[in-house]
Design a protein with these regions (language model features):
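Acidic, polar-rich low-complexity tracts and alpha-helical solenoid repeat scaffolds
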Residues: 1-225
Length: 225
């Protein structure tokens, strides 16, 4: 019915609102391709769009791989502390990631992970924040602490073992071999890669203790290598 009103060739003062209704109808059906032009026309004419309007347009744009547009809409939503802002920060991180702006994505995921409104979104955001912290380094806090926070918060999560492996590598690359070995000991299953890391780290720690004259301690490490 909404499309019929728009297609009858008569412009009315209600056209803007009709575009919104039609666009949201398509949005609710998951037909983002059809929703996009209607929501776009509505936002182009609406001087004071609601936060929900902006979020919907950002989400639709992202689904259609118009990620630069999505970033623009989401960025209008992140100046508040609200459930919608938490979601917007997470989706903003996804859009930045799609465009290769990983540092910006890291910051967006961090902000989303610090909000408690939606536990599922918080978990997803913290997962991405931890992964990017490991990959890029983290200007806000120690990467290993971020990964450990995920493990502590979601000890039985589906991604926790993956995070434990990341923690091993994070400690290894920072040169903290004792923490690396401790993290290795908490893995449920060890891959060939982590077994090799365990051998090498044990040997390095053994050599350190041997050079200090701590032969008994060194022997324990050498037995693990």
């Amino acid at each position: 019915e909404g499309n019929e009103l728009l297609n009858n060739g008569k412009s009315t003062s209600y056209d803007t609102e009709i575009h919104k209704i039609v666009g949201e109808s398509y949005f609710m059906k998951g037909d983002y391709q059809s929703a996009y032009p209607h929501l776009k026309l509505f936002l182009d004419k609406e001087q004071t769009p609601s936060e929900s309007d902006l979020y919907e347009m950002g989400f639709v744009s992202a689904q259609l791989k118009k990620n630069d547009e999505a970033v623009g809409y989401y960025n209008q939503l992140i100046n508040s502390n609200s459930p919608l802002a938490q979601n917007a920060y997470y989706q903003l991180g996804n859009a930045y990631l799609e465009t290769g702006k990983k540092q910006e994505a890291l910051s967006a995921y961090r902000n989303s992970s610090q909000m408690n409104y939606d536990p599922k979104v918080q978990q997803l955001a913290l997962e991405q924040y931890a992964k990017l912290s490991y990959e890029l380094g983290n200007p806000f806090e120690n990467s290993s602490k971020v990964i450990q926070r995920y493990i502590d918060k979601y000890p039985s999560g589906s991604k926790t073992q993956e995070m434990r492996s990341l923690l091993v590598k994070s400690y290894l690359y920072s040169g903290d071999y004792k923490a690396t070995l401790e993290a290795l000991g908490k893995l449920d299953q060890k891959t060939n890669e982590t077994k090799k890391i365990e051998q090498e780290v044990s040997y390095l720690l053994g050599s350190e203790e041997f050079n200090k004259g701590n032969f008994d301690v060194a022997e324990k490490y050498f037995k693990q290598s």
